[in-house]
């Protein structure tokens, strides 16, 4: 059967391809270290699990409103006020089946054919594909490594056309882990206000920040910027709840209403049980979150120092999330590979270390390593990479 053009044009996920190959090697009995994970390696905190079990025993196993439980939307609104001093009414919030689906639904309701969305590179792999699925056109603006992968107001201005509808800002970033400062966000925001561009602020890694740095949302900088922004967030990364599939969007009532209408004809509601777990996540203790954040920071500081000692590797130190995004072009060349993608494939075949080539994130000279695994495995992986480079150089 001939498939729809919009699906046939999709680019397969580089991350999933590497993960599948790693699983294949593991199944064959090889000692594979996988650093492709996009999820915390900690279990969901117990009080959240208990709340979900309790909700089932209390009979909360039926449909909920398409936009999410009122109690959960109230908890999210309280979280915004408590953490970022932003005020949203429940009618300005929609709960979705994960932050990814919140983004998908948003693009579906704001984009018409050929509308343009500015996406800074490097980017999370699903941004351009979701834009294309909604009929839009991704427009890439390069975040240079010497600028810590962040774009400037001038770059943004130069990318704007009469078809520009939105820009995606992801801070802390997947895959780089860098964060925009308040001053940088304010400058980008002024350009967006001047040209009436919607700001899509992906804040899913908000709680995972390091070096004493605190996340800043562009929506908290002014009332005008709040009105011009849709925030995407969820409990997946902050509370180690990736499998629960609870995310949300917060923005103007007209956009949220349209997203809710679309959800009513697509997913209906997010899983009722997971929603009760998310309520417990936002109303429960913060100690498990801080313990996870501290563990990630310790891993980062330990392996970053070892990684940059590998010949041919350079790396901007992350400020958040749980990824390293080093430039490996020089290492690949010194090892005799035509590009970084070939380097990554050979590394997996020979040393059984799975990392993700940066080509899938719009940066073909880089690779992404997740430190969402044990420190022992991380240190062993770095040793294997170093051995691989020294052997081929």
Swiss-Prot record:
The keyword Transferase applies. The modification N6-(pyridoxal phosphate)lysine is found at residue 237. One of its GO terms (molecular function) is pyridoxal phosphate binding. Its cofactor is pyridoxal 5'-phosphate. The gene is aspB. This is Aspartate aminotransferase. Keywords: Aminotransferase, Cytoplasm, Pyridoxal phosphate, Transferase. It comes from Bacillus subtilis (strain 168). The lineage of its organism: Bacteria, Bacillati, Bacillota, Bacilli, Bacillales. Its main location: cytoplasm.
